């Protein structure tokens, strides 16, 4: 069902070109704006001198217009009637020509146009599309096609821009599209060839066996390997390790893949994971082998990550179960403990009687409590009383039976490595790898460095022997902590590898060092940075202290053990009658719309569906693809599945078409690009610009129950009850658009938000440039404050108890008046000086995308013994957190702004909840990719709703002004596009639009349509 060339212009292929690209290539699509007229059609004195050589006004105007056209369009026009009137008048005025109708004479002789084109090419050094320019463009396109999987439409735009930049006359669209197709095909064939040559003959035979059934299942081995773990248990871990081992045994992991483009490998592997075994078997031998190699290489890493995720989750379950068992034991033993404590208290009271002689105390105590009874009480207390640092390790040791089911697989299969801080854990791992298969009950020669004080009594018995059970559980507890800090890591794993190895290093760091310092805006001398911070902090302390007496919202409370500030809650803003009236008028004007039509209408405005391209055949286009894409997005976002949207009599909505579209077009990269289109379009709307400039955003999580078995979910009784769930962490700009070019991050359970704040900010791909991020308390930590400052961002969380926070000072002797009592923390700038270059190297690595922010932050946050780098980042974070706190208590408008932005995020979540109405709003995808794709679709559809509302609210405002209404700018700034009562998300789903709406026109506002009796 590939598109055929248009009958209107058969020489222009539209296999991959959008309608907009077809209509705009070498043509005017409307009147150029003032900036474009000034840039491309302005004639300087040299131009006028050249033009003056032509005889007659018609020739002078004609050649002048051709000069402007070749600058603006990249080519000459044969029909001057296609030049907009504004361009003709603008050019004629510069030449002093009053009557532009003389232009009709210019088109009478074709030779004149040809001669003028030749003169312009010669005078302005324009060139035909020929050698060496064909070679240079081909080389550029080939390089881009080789390293990335860019859509051919993007390559077409790139090629057009490159040709115009180098003053090459645009060739026919057919020539350019054919060149792009040939180049992309050549790059693809090269990738297939290189991948197919990696395996040996024996390995190729083994890879072909992936397509055949396994011994114990009708499924092919490939299909079996696609299925990751869905439960958290010892057997599930063993199966996950066997899955990784099967992929690892192909022996492809050791090959040098540094010369192959990572993005294209990833896309090819994803395609292998989505398509059927039948489709792979039908491929050419070279492509089939390339797909299988890419699958094994990618899934080997994924399988190892999955196995380690199961291990981490399983250890967490063991610890949680041990805690539950311990707490139950504690409750059952409380009566005995209370009884024994009272008896001991009575016995000890005899020791305090002054009248009893020392030599008689023992006899008097035993007269009250017999010696044997007292010994029994003491024994009982020792058994059931727990030290203050108890972590239910006794109950963990009781879980040994669960551990021994999976530990041999762990020790014998996974190869751990370590940083210096993890050497002791690695030594213990190596020891257990050698000794665990023995039947020894005591490991007296085991490394003891991992045995902490709280574990000692459980690991070392009364006879001073190191017990097998105690040591094993102690090791697993230490291993989990070391893995989470990445002191111990697994080479070959993406999520559990060594983040330090991904930082800028060696020659790479030295080559980029000065650029990184400049881009981050920090001086190379740490003393300069510290001096600047010290000046800011000192002046801010003094300003806030001077105004504190006038600040009625803040009081200094000295009644407690430590002085603290109390901050009055913000009073709700009154909603004036004018705002209520304006909101009501706009609400009444918004026309009702089905969500299906809304998506198609937003596509007519933005063309977001053009960002969806086939996973392996990017040039493939089918008729009415936007309809199919909108249907699939609707199915995912509304959580209703494809079934309600299938129409057997509509080619774009058949079961086969929708399944094919979902499998080949819906994925993170396409959703991200489409989402960026919506966000960028929203930023151009005048109403959105009134709400904000895109410099501010908030981050928050939206919780979803996951009732299916999956390892990518976690427990939290507050949000999920007795179930498990996930958190969709997403960002909302001050223009109400949701972003992170990334559509959101899916987090198992409710992990700390602070781990993911920076990741979303750094990876977002929209045109917005947020520099200030607002979060709830959960997203705040000294480390995050420090990283934000290093990267040049302002972190503005809403702290639950800001007045009780520690305020830090840099000058120990400075007098801050009434704030002296709360400025208790003393920062240590020496730590910053010692680690300054390392701090900037880390920040630069994050900025350049060398390391994933969540991985790095997680490893830094988990450390019980922070490294010098972590301490330095925390130190600079404390200073910046204090600057934030001083601003927070001093400026009510600042507090109000934070609250307003966070409320926008919560209101947007309410719209998303309304959209995701199917299956009780529960996410039933088992694997991370499926969860991310579905919630990405939800974010995209939510953005479409926000954009549609903004467009029609703008139209409603224009309508009200035209009717003579006086509108208050302050009221307009408080309007919100987060409404959905007029949008139908249920019932019969229709994907048809009125012709005018399809062409980008707005549907009538409700009031106007009722007046004209338009449905």
UniProtKB/Swiss-Prot annotation:
Keywords: DNA recombination, DNA-binding, Transposable element, Transposition. The keyword rRNA-binding does not apply. One of its GO terms (molecular function) is transposase activity. GO terms for biological process: DNA transposition. Coiled coil: none annotated. InterPro entries: DUF4158, Tn3-like_transpos, Tn3_Tnp_DDE_dom. The keyword DNA-binding applies. NCBIfam families: transpos_Tn3 (NF033527). Belongs to the transposase 7 family. Required for transposition of transposon Tn3. This is Transposase for transposon Tn3. The gene is tnpA.
């Amino acid at each position: 069902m590939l598109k055929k060339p248009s009958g209107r212009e058969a020489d222009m292929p539209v296999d991959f070109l959008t309608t907009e690209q077809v209509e705009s290539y070498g043509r005017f699509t409307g009147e150029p704006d003032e900036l474009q007229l000034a840039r491309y059609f302005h004639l300087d004195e040299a131009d006028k001198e050249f033009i003056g050589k032509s005889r007659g006004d018609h020739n002078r105007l004609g050649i002048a217009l051709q000069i402007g056209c070749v600058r603006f369009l990249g080519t000459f026009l044969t029909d001057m009637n296609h030049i907009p009137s504004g361009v003709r008048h603008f050019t004629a005025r510069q030449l002093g020509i009053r009557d532009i109708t003389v232009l009709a004479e210019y088109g009478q002789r074709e030779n004149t146009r040809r001669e003028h084109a030749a003169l312009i090419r010669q005078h302005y050094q324009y060139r035909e599309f020929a050698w060496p320019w064909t070679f240079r463009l081909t080389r550029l396109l080939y390089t881009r096609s080789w390293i990335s999987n860019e859509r051919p439409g993007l390559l077409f735009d790139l090629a057009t821009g490159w040709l115009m930049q180098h003053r090459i006359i645009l060739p026919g669209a057919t020539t350019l599209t054919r060149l792009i197709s040939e180049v992309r095909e050549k790059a693809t064939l090269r990738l297939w060839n290189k991948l197919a040559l990696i395996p040996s003959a024996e390995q190729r035979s083994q890879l072909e066996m992936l397509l055949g059934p396994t011994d114990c299942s009708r499924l092919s081995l490939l299909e079996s390997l696609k299925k990751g773990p869905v439960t958290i248990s010892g057997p599930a871990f063993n199966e996950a390790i066997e899955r990784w081992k099967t992929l690892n045994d192909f022996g492809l992991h050791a090959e040098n893949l540094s010369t192959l483009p990572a993005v294209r490998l990833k896309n090819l592997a994803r395609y292998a994971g989505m398509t059927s075994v039948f489709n792979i078997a039908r491929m050419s031998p070279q492509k089939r082998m390339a797909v299988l190699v890419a699958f094994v290489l990618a899934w080997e890493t994924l399988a190892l990550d999955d196995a380690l995720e199961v291990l981490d989750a399983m250890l967490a379950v063991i610890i949680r179960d041990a805690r539950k068992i311990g707490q139950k034991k504690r409750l059952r033993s409380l009566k005995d403990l209370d009884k024994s404590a009272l008896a001991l208290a009575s016995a000890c009271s005899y020791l305090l009687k002054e009248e009893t002689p020392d030599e008689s105390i023992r006899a008097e105590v035993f007269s009250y409590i017999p010696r044997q009874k007292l010994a029994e009480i003491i024994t009982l207390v020792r058994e059931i009383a727990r030290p203050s640092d108890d972590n239910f390790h006794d109950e963990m040791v009781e879980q040994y039976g669960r551990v021994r089911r999976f530990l041999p697989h762990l020790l014998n299969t996974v190869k751990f490595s370590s940083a210096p801080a993890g050497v002791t854990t690695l030594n213990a791992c190596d020891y257990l790898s050698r000794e665990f298969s023995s039947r020894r009950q005591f490991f007296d020669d085991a490394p003891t460095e991992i045995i902490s004080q709280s574990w000692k009594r459980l690991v070392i018995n009364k006879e001073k022997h190191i017990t097998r059970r105690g040591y094993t559980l102690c090791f697993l507890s230490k291993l989990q902590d070391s893995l989470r800090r990445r002191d111990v890591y697994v080479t070959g794993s993406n999520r559990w590898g060594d983040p330090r190895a991904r930082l800028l290093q060696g020659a790479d760091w030295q080559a980029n060092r000065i650029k990184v310092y400049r881009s981050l805006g920090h001086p190379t001398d740490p003393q300069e940075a510290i001096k600047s911070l010290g000046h800011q902090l000192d002046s801010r302390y003094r300003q806030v202290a001077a105004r504190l007496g006038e600040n009625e919202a803040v009081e200094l409370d000295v009644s407690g053990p430590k002085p603290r500030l109390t901050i009055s809650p913000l009073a709700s803003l009154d909603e004036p009658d004018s705002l209520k009236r304006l909101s009501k008028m706009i609400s009444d004007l918004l026309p009702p719309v089905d969500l299906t039509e809304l998506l198609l209408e937003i596509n007519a405005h933005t063309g977001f569906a053009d960002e969806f391209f086939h996973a392996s055949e990017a040039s493939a286009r089918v008729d009415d693809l936007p309809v199919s894409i909108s249907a699939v997005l609707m199915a995912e976002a509304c959580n209703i599945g494809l079934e309600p949207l299938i129409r057997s009599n509509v080619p774009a909505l058949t079961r086969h078409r929708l399944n094919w579209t979902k499998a080949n077009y819906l994925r993170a990269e396409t959703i991200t690009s489409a989402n960026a289109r919506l966000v960028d379009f929203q930023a151009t709307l005048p109403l959105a610009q009134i709400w904000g400039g895109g410099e501010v955003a908030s981050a928050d999580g939206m919780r979803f129950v996951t009732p299916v078995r999956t390892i990518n979910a976690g427990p939290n009784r507050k949000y999920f009850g007795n179930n498990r769930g996930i958190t969709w962490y997403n960002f909302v700009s001050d223009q109400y658009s949701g972003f992170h070019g990334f559509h959101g991050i899916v987090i198992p359970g409710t992990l700390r938000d602070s781990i993911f704040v920076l990741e979303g900010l750094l990876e977002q791909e929209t045109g917005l440039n947020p520099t200030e991020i607002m979060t709830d308390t959960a997203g705040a930590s000294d480390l995050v404050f420090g990283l934000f400052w290093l990267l040049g961002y302002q972190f503005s969380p809403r702290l639950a108890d800001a007045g009780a926070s520690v305020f830090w000072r840099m000058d120990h002797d400075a007098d801050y008046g009434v704030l002296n009592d709360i400025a208790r923390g003393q920062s240590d700038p020496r730590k910053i000086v010692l680690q300054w270059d390392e701090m900037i190297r880390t920040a630069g690595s994050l900025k350049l995308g060398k390391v994933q922010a969540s991985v790095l932050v997680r490893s830094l946050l988990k450390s019980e013994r922070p490294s010098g780098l972590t301490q330095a980042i925390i130190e600079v974070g404390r200073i910046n957190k204090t600057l934030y706190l001083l601003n927070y208590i001093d400026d009510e408008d600042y507090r109000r702004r934070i609250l307003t932005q966070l409320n926008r995020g919560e209101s947007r979540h309410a719209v998303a909840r309304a959209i995701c109405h199917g299956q009780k709003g529960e996410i039933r995808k088992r694997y991370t990719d499926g969860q991310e794709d579905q919630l990405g679709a939800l974010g995209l559809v939510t953005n479409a709703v926000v954009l549609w509302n903004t467009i029609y609210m703008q139209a409603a405002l224009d309508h009200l002004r035209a009717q003579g209404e006086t509108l208050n700018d302050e009221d307009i700034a408080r309007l919100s596009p987060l409404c959905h009562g007029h949008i139908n998300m249920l019932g019969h789903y229709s994907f048809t639009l009125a012709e005018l709406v399809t062409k980008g026109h707005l549907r009538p506002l409700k009031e106007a349509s009722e007046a004209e009796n338009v449905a």
